[in-house]
Every structure is written in structure tokens, then in C-alpha cells.
């Protein structure tokens, strides 16, 4: 089963949107297999955003993600990576469609509420960076037969 990493950033936590964001993924039929509240260290932030290290906005990314608690999650299900990206919406909330998390709740590109892995390799890397295998729970929801053939 495909897995993805989703993080509710400090602005989403501070604004009380954790439940609303989780509910959108649950309502879609995806399964939560890992969840924790994290005060992100400088080291974790720099590792997470490593591909942006040489970009001018890198220091701002690191400063923001370490500015408050983050809800780190692992979700699984058929096509979860692409579906989660659609649910999240475009990076700039002003360009995001209504009905997406960023389109409904976001205003500023620098405070865009949530991060989602952009592909299978990224998901694997991010899950391994944020979670130990022992923190992920394998379980079968009672509704699974109503979601998948």
C-alpha cells in the first residue's frame, strides 16, 4: 500500500486547523498510520529542506518550520501521494482551488499550512527522516472493504 508524509506546519497548528486537515484525509478514505506532535530541530529542518539549501528562501523555510510545533503524519492508501497533493492544493494559497486545504484556509505562500510528499521517493525519504519504523502502526480499518475492491 502506498504511503505519504504529511506535515501540518506551525501556522496550521497555531490556527487550530489540525482536526479539519486530518478529517479531509480520513473522509477521503485514507488511513493514518503515524502521527506525532514535534518541535522541529534545526537539524531536522535542514535535512527536510535539503534540496532547497542553495535557494535564497532556505533560511526562511528553516526558521518558519522551527518556529512552533508541527504535526507529522504518515498516511497510506491507493494513490495517496497524488490524492493528498490535490487535497492540499497549489503551493501559493492564492492560486489554490477552492475546496483544497490551501484554497480554503491559506492566504500567504510563506504560511501555506501543510506539506505533502511530491512523489514515492520523496515520501520514503521524508517518512524515514521523521519517523522510526516502530512509530508506524499497521492496522486494518473496519471500513476497508467499503473503500477498496
From Swiss-Prot:
The keyword Transferase applies. ATP binds at residues 9, 57, 85, 91, 102, 112. This is Nucleoside diphosphate kinase. It is found in: Cytoplasm. Homotetramer. Gene3D superfamilies: Nucleoside diphosphate kinase-like domain (3.30.70.141). Its EC number is 2.7.4.6. Its cofactor is Mg(2+). Coiled coil: none annotated. NCBIfam families: PRK00668.1. SUPFAM superfamilies: Nucleoside diphosphate kinase, NDK. The active site is at 115 (pros-phosphohistidine intermediate). The lineage of its organism: Bacteria, Bacillati, Cyanobacteriota, Cyanophyceae, Synechococcales. Belongs to the NDK family. InterPro entries: NDK-like_dom (IPR034907), NDK-like_dom_sf (IPR036850), Nucleoside_diP_kinase (IPR001564), Nucleoside_diP_kinase_AS (IPR023005). Keywords: ATP-binding, Cytoplasm, Kinase, Magnesium, Metal-binding, Nucleotide metabolism, Nucleotide-binding, Phosphoprotein, Transferase. HAMAP family: NDP_kinase. Transmembrane segments: none annotated. One of its GO terms (biological process) is UTP biosynthetic process. The keyword Cytoplasm applies. It catalyses: dZDP + ATP = dZTP + ADP; a 2'-deoxyribonucleoside 5'-diphosphate + ATP = a 2'-deoxyribonucleoside 5'-triphosphate + ADP; a ribonucleoside 5'-diphosphate + ATP = a ribonucleoside 5'-triphosphate + ADP.
Amino acid at each position: 500500500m502506498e504511503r505519504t508524509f504529511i506535515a501540518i506546519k506551525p501556522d496550521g497548528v497555531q490556527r487550530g486547523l489540525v482536526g479539519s486537515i486530518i478529517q479531509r484525509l480520513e473522509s477521503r478514505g485514507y488511513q493514518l498510520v503515524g502521527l506525532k506532535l514535534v518541535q522541529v530541530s534545526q537539524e531536522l529542518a535542514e535535512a527536510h529542506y535539503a534540496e532547497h539549501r542553495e535557494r535564497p528562501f532556505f533560511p526562511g523555510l528553516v526558521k518558519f518550520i522551527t518556529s512552533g510545533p508541527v504535526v507529522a503524519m504518515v498516511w497510506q492508501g491507493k494513490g495517496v501521494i497524488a490524492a493528498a497533493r490535490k487535497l492540499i492544493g497549489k503551493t501559493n494559497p492564492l492560486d489554490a482551488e477552492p475546496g483544497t486545504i490551501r484554497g480554503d484556509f491559506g492566504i500567504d505562500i510563506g504560511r501555506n499550512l501543510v506539506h505533502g510528499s511530491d512523489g514515492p521517493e520523496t515520501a520514503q525519504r521524508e517518512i524515514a527522516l521523521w519517523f522510526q519504523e516502530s512509530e508506524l502502526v499497521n492496522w486494518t480499518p473496519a471500513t476497508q472493504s467499503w473503500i477498496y475492491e
